[in-house]
Amino acid sequence: MNKIYEDNSFTIGNTPLVRLNNIGNGNILAKIESRNPSFSVKCRIGANMIWDAEKKGRLNKNIEIIEATSGNTGIALAYVAAARNYSLTLIMPDSMSIERRKLLKSLGAHLILTNGKHGMKGAISKANEIVSLNTKRYLLLKQFENPANPEIHQKTTGPEIWKDTKGNIDILISGVGTGGTITGITKYIKIKEGKKDLISVAVEPLESPVITQFLSGKKIKPGLHKIQGIGAGFIPKNLDLSLIDRIITVSSEEAIFNAKKIMKKEGILSGISSGAAIAAALKIQKENDFKNKNIVVILPSSGERYLSTELFSRSFKNENNY
């Protein structure tokens, strides 16, 4: 690659799309987002939210960035903040992996932990509380509603997938954390490229199916789960439900099992939310209408970020169930 980048924030994107040969029927294509500079899909939004704040004059060296995160967005913001010389404070539920805490600190971020039982809502509440004490000192990026989040996927991830598949994509599968990934990619393919028949599938935890509850008119009852990075427990503003065609729920155990499976059978190091996306792909591929369709699955992060979790600490007795 004959190019010198201005700083590491500009190295996002152009991640590989890899055919799975040992899982599914050969029509599942995995978008490996761990090939981004801080090894997750969140690198894209971490860079773009900071670039956007700079362009709009909301960020300078006297302002400290603050954000609530489940880990990967925080790591992405931390690497960009380090590369562009900004101070950063992150608020994260203490239920997230030890690896995430260590990475954040190593990248120079100040880390505040909140009670894990309150989930992302608790972290967001704490971030808002801190900013309210000094609105001139802090910039809260608000990843769940910041339009720079889906924008970067509409500008980069969507076009990359379209180019690599030559437009031959029938189904997109993505877990929902902030909703930015699936919204941005789907908007690009359905609206910009005009492929209205794309089936966009959102994945959420079975234990916390708030999107499913919302769409069925039921009371939203978030629950605890182990799929770090998706299932925030509320409907994020960046999730455009008008673009989504299907919701598939995946249990924490299914997600962990399939993350192990893709590592062992395909040689792709994958995190738990990647396992959830693969589980959803295998479910939809079993349906007669979709068994021969081209499926693109977003794999958000790599396995090393989960060494202290159940992804690496136990095996399953009921593997045949999946």
Curated annotation (Swiss-Prot):
Keyword Transferase listed: yes
Pathway recorded for this protein: Amino-acid biosynthesis; L-cysteine biosynthesis; L-cysteine from L-serine: step 2/2
A matching Pfam family: PALP
Keywords assigned: Allosteric enzyme, Amino-acid biosynthesis, Cysteine biosynthesis, Pyridoxal phosphate, Transferase
Residues engaged in binding pyridoxal 5'-phosphate: 72, 177-181, 273
Reactions performed catalytically: O-acetyl-L-serine + hydrogen sulfide = L-cysteine + acetate
Ranges that cross the membrane: none
Single GO term (MF): cysteine synthase activity
Gene3D superfamilies: 3.40.50.1100
Top-level taxon in the UniProt lineage: Bacteria
EC number: 2.5.1.47
Sites where the protein binds hydrogen sulfide: 8, 35, 269
In-chain residues carrying the UniProt-annotated modification N6-(pyridoxal phosphate)lysine: 42
NCBIfam families according to UniProt: cysK, cysKM
Family: Belongs to the cysteine synthase/cystathionine beta-synthase family.
Name recorded for this polypeptide: Cysteine synthase
